[in-house]
């Protein structure tokens, strides 16, 4: 039951921080809209990314106290995209492959 409470708290805090990060990045709260080619989710995208990042970080870190939980949720929710990219980077390193950035840098330019 303790883990469920931690995940719920991480969802709430991460979602709020994701929305605050969206406002800081864009300068305003953008509503979802549809264009001819795609659906732009606006602030919902950053809300979902912040929530997901904070859940993943809390589940992987397993905080001992409430203060650690809140701090981890705030940090991961605010920088949600960077946290998710770091999880992808760690997964690539653990699978024995090189990260995509290093593969791109080692290629020689065509002549």
Swiss-Prot record:
A cellular-component GO term for this protein: plasma membrane
Spans traversing the lipid bilayer: 4-23, 39-61, 65-84
Record flagged with keyword Chaperone: no
Pfam families: DUF4257 (PF14074)
Keyword Iron-sulfur: no
Organism of origin: Bacillus subtilis (strain 168)
Topology of this chain in the membrane: Multi-pass membrane protein
Designated name of the protein: Uncharacterized protein YtvB
Keywords in alphabetical order: Cell membrane, Membrane, Transmembrane, Transmembrane helix
Disulphide-bonded residues: none
Subcellular location: Cell membrane
